[in-house]
UniProtKB/Swiss-Prot annotation:
PANTHER family hit by this protein: POTASSIUM VOLTAGE-GATED CHANNEL SUBFAMILY KQT MEMBER 1, POTASSIUM VOLTAGE-GATED CHANNEL SUBFAMILY KQT MEMBER 4
Protein name (record): Potassium voltage-gated channel subfamily KQT member 1
Binding partners and assembly: Tetramer. Heterotetramer with KCNE1; form the native cardiac channel I(Ks) which increases the amplitude and slows down the activation kinetics of outward potassium current and targets to the membrane raft. Interacts (via C-terminus) with CALM; forms a heterooctameric structure (with 4:4 KCNQ1:CALM stoichiometry) in a calcium-independent manner. Interacts with AKAP9; targets protein kinase A (PKA) catalytic and regulatory subunits and protein phosphatase 1 (PP1) to the KCNQ1-KCNE1 complex, allowing PKA-mediated phosphorylation and increase of delayed rectifier potassium channel activity.
Cytoplasmic side of membrane: 1-119, 176-191, 242-259, 348-668
A GO molecular-function descriptor: calmodulin binding
Region described as Interaction with CALM: 369-381, 514-528
Species: Mus musculus
Length: 668
C-alpha cells in the first residue's frame, strides 16, 4: 500500500521505465525496492531482522535517494524518490506471503497437540489412543498364566517405545507452549507444567523410566514392576482426553441440575438410613438356618440397605422375620425410586446439553453471515461517500512478481508461484465461496501522450528476455484490444499499470465498484437468510407459536385502540336496543342507524324550511292574493315562485304545492 509520500503517477511511471532502461544499459537487473524499512531476510547468518534497506542502482548509475524521516521536496535533477511502505506483517493491505517465523511454527505445533482440529490431528491422537489401549491389553494378558511369557516380553519393548514417545511429546509440548503470552519464559513454562494433565504426563514418564531402569531384569519385568506398569497404564488413559472436555461436560451437567440431584440424593440417603435402622431393630435377634445372626450390628444393616436400594442384591444378608421383610419391602420401594432418579436427571441433562450445543452451532453459523451482511451493507452506504478512505482499499499495490525482472527465468517458476499461492490461501482457511469478498486490484492503461519518446519495445526485449506469452508483443504500442477475452489474454503482455492513488480512480471505476458492492450485498443477504432458517421441527413449531402469540398481542392492541377511538357499545347503546337485537351492535347495523337518524333530521329540516318560506311569503304581500296567485300559477302551469322551494338539491313537498287558501273575511 502506498503512503502519502508516494510520488505522482507520471513521475512514478517515468521512474519505472528509467529503472528498466538503466538495467539494460548496465547489463544488470535492478532489484525493485519500494520499501524504506523492510524485513531483511536471507542474510549471511540466515537471520531475519528489521533493518533499513537502501535501494541500489545499476553499476554506473547514481543510487536514488532514500526516503528521509521528514520528507522534503527533492530537486528535479536528483531522480525520483523511492516509495515508502510498511512491512507486510504491519500493513493490512499487503498481498505478500507471510513469513514463517519461530513463533508461527510454535503456534502450529501447539494447536496440533493442544487444540486438535482436522483429520490429521484426529489420526494422530487416535493412533496414540490405540497404542495406549494395546499396551493396556498386553498388561492385562500378562496376568494370565498361558499368555504371561509372551505378553511380558512384548510389554517390555512397548513400554520402552512409549516412554521415549511420551517423553519427546512432553518436551515438544513444553516448547510449543511459548507461543502463548502466559507461557512465555521459564516462569511461563512452569505455569504450563503445573496444569493437572501436564503433571499426570510428567508422573507417567518419570515413573515409567524408573520402573524400566530399576524393576527390569534383562528383557523381563519383576513382579513389583509389573504391578507399577499396570497402574501407569491406567494413568496413561487420562492422556487421551487432554482438553478435559469429558470432565467439563459432566461438571456442567451436574452444576446445572445440582438442585435436583441434591434433593434426590438427600431423600434417598434418608430412606437408606431409616430402612437400615428399622430392619436392624427387627432382625438383631433373629437367627438364620445356620445359627448365625445376620444383622448383628448396624453396619451389617447399612450394608444390606446399600446393596438393596442400589438394586445390586448380593443376597448375602436376608431378613428372617416377617416384620423385617415387611419393613424392607416398604422402604425398598420408596428408597429405590429416589436412588434411580439421579440417572434419569443426568441423562436428560446430557440430552439437553447436546441439543444446546447443536443450537449453538446453528447460531454460530449465523455470525459470519451477519458480519458479512453488515460489512457489505456498510460498503454500499460508504460508496456514496466521496472521502478517499472509502476507495483506498481498491488501490493497494498487487503482489510483487520477481519473474518479470529476472535475467534468467525458469519455466516452472510461475507454476511454483501458483502452487505457493494456492497453499497460502488454503492455510489461511479461505474457501472459494469466501474469495468473492476479496478486494480486487484496479489497473489502467498508461496514456499515450505521457510515454517518453525514447521508449521502445525492442530495447525492452534486448534487456529482459521472457517467455513469448509475457513480454513479446506484436504491436509496437500498448493498445487495448476490442474484446474482453483478448484483454485477458494480453493482460501479461500489456503490463497494465496498477492504480496507486485514489485520485487516479475515474467515474467508471467508481460505478463498477458500486455495482460489485451491491451484488456482494445481495449475496450476503441471501446467505444470511439461509443461515436464519430453523434446522429442526421443534424450532419451526416454536417459531410458529411465537408468531401466533405476537399476532394475538397485536390483535388485542388493535381492539384496544378501536375501543379507545370509537368507544365500546355498552357506552352509547341503550339496554332496550341490546335486548331487541343482539346483532345490531355490528358496524353495518350502526351505520344503518346513523343513516336513519340523518334521514329523519333531513325531513325535519325540510318541514322547518317550508314553514319559514310560508311566513316570509305572508309578510311580503297579501296572503290571499299571493296564495291564490301562487296556486293558480301553479295550476295553470306557469312559473312558480322559487321561494316556495327548498334549495336546488331538494324537491318541493306536497304541503308546499297545496297551500290552504283563506277567504277575504279571514284575511281582514
Amino acid at each position: 500500500m502506498d503512503t502519502a509520500s508516494s510520488p505522482p503517477s507520471a513521475e512514478r511511471k517515468r521512474a519505472g521505465w528509467s529503472r528498466l532502461l538503466g538495467a539494460r544499459r548496465g547489463s544488470a537487473v535492478v532489484k525493485k525496492c519500494p520499501f524504506s524499512l523492510e524485513l531483511a531476510e536471507g542474510g549471511p547468518e540466515g537471520s531475519t531482522v528489521y533493518a533499513p534497506i537502501a535501494p541500489t542502482g545499476a553499476p554506473g548509475l547514481a543510487p536514488p535517494m532514500s526516503t528521509p524521516v521528514s520528507p522534503a521536496p527533492a530537486p528535479a535533477d536528483l531522480g525520483p524518490r523511492p516509495r515508502v511502505s510498511l512491512d507486510p506483517r504491519v500493513s493490512i493491505y499487503s498481498a505478500r506471503r507471510p513469513l514463517l517465523a519461530r513463533t508461527h511454527i510454535q503456534g502450529r505445533v501447539y494447536n496440533f497437540l493442544e487444540r486438535p482440529t482436522g483429520w490429521k490431528c484426529f489420526v494422530y491422537h487416535f493412533t496414540v489412543f490405540l497404542i495406549v489401549l494395546v499396551c493396556l491389553i498386553f498388561s492385562v494378558l500378562s496376568t494370565i498364566e498361558q499368555y504371561a511369557a509372551l505378553a511380558t516380553g512384548t510389554l517390555f519393548w512397548m513400554e520402552i517405545v512409549l516412554v521415549v514417545f511420551f517423553g519427546t511429546e512432553y518436551v515438544v509440548r513444553l516448547w510449543s507452549a511459548g507461543c502463548r503470552s502466559k507461557y512465555v519464559g521459564i516462569w511461563g513454562r512452569l505455569r504450563f507444567a503445573r496444569k493437572p494433565i501436564s503433571i499426570i504426563d510428567l508422573i507417567v514418564v518419570v515413573a515409567s523410566m524408573v520402573v524400566l531402569c530399576v524393576g527390569s531384569k534383562g528383557q523381563v519385568f519383576a513382579t513389583s514392576a509389573i504391578r507399577g506398569i499396570r497402574f501407569l497404564q491406567i494413568l496413561r488413559m487420562l492422556h487421551v482426553d487432554r482438553q478435559g472436555g469429558t470432565w467439563r461436560l459432566l461438571g456442567s451437567v451436574v452444576f446445572i441440575h445440582r438442585q435436583e440431584l441434591i434433593t434426590t440424593l438427600y431423600i434417598g440417603f434418608l430412606g437408606l438410613i431409616f430402612s437400615s435402622y428399622f430392619v436392624y431393630l427387627a432382625e438383631k435377634d433373629a437367627v438364620n438356618e445356620s445359627g448365625r445372626i445376620e444383622f448383628g450390628s448396624y453396619a451389617d444393616a447399612l450394608w444390606w440397605g446399600v446393596v438393596t436400594v442400589t438394586t445390586i442384591g448380593y443376597g448375602d444378608k436376608v431378613p428372617q422375620t416377617w416384620v423385617g421383610k415387611t419393613i424392607a419391602s416398604c422402604f425398598s420401594v420408596f428408597a429405590i425410586s429416589f436412588f434411580a432418579l439421579p440417572a434419569g436427571i443426568l441423562g436428560s441433562g446430557f440430552a439437553l446439553k447436546v441439543q444446546q450445543k447443536q443450537r449453538q452451532k446453528h447460531f454460530n453459523r449465523q455470525i459470519p453471515a451477519a458480519a458479512s451482511l453488515i460489512q457489505t451493507a456498510w460498503r454500499c452506504y460508504a460508496a456514496e461517500n466521496p472521502d478517499s478512505a472509502t476507495w483506498k482499499i481498491y488501490v493497494r499495490k498487487p503482489a510483487r512478481s520477481h519473474t518479470l525482472l529476472s535475467p534468467s527465468p525458469k519455466p516452472k517458476k510461475s507454476v511454483m508461484v501458483k502452487k505457493k499461492k494456492f497453499k497460502l490461501d488454503k492455510d489461511n482457511g479461505m474457501s472459494p465461496g469466501e474469495k468473492m469478498f476479496n478486494v480486487p486490484h484496479i489497473t489502467y492503461d498508461p496514456p499515450e501522450d505521457r510515454r517518453p519518446d525514447h521508449f521502445s519495445i525492442d530495447g525492452y526485449d534486448s534487456s529482459v528476455r521472457k517467455s513469448p506469452t509475457l513480454l513479446e508483443v506484436s504491436t509496437p504500442h500498448f493498445l487495448r484490444t476490442n474484446s474482453f477475452a483478448e484483454d485477458l489474454d494480453l493482460e501479461g503482455e500489456t503490463l497494465l499499470t496498477p492504480i496507486t492513488h485514489v485520485s487516479q480512480l475515474r467515474d467508471h471505476h467508481r460505478a463498477t465498484i458500486k455495482v460489485i458492492r451491491r451484488m456482494q450485498y445481495f449475496v450476503a443477504k441471501k446467505k444470511f437468510q439461509q443461515a436464519r432458517k430453523p434446522y429442526d421441527v421443534r424450532d419451526v413449531i416454536e417459531q410458529y407459536s411465537q408468531g401466533h402469540l405476537n399476532l394475538m398481542v397485536r390483535i388485542k392492541e388493535l381492539q384496544r385502540r378501536l375501543d379507545q377511538s370509537i368507544g365500546k357499545p355498552s357506552l352509547f347503546i341503550p339496554i332496550s336496543e341490546k335486548s331487541k337485537d343482539r346483532g345490531s351492535n355490528t358496524i353495518g347495523a350502526r351505520l344503518n342507524r346513523v343513516e336513519d337518524k340523518v334521514t329523519q333530521l333531513d325531513q325535519r329540516l325540510v318541514i322547518i324550511t317550508d314553514m319559514l318560506h310560508q311566513l316570509l311569503s305572508m309578510q311580503q304581500g297579501g296572503p290571499t292574493c299571493n296564495s291564490r296567485s301562487q296556486v293558480v300559477a301553479s295550476n295553470e302551469g306557469g312559473s312558480i315562485n322559487p321561494e316556495l322551494f327548498l334549495p336546488s338539491n331538494s324537491l318541493p313537498t306536497y304541503e308546499q304545492l297545496t297551500v290552504p287558501q283563506t277567504g277575504p273575511d279571514e284575511g281582514s
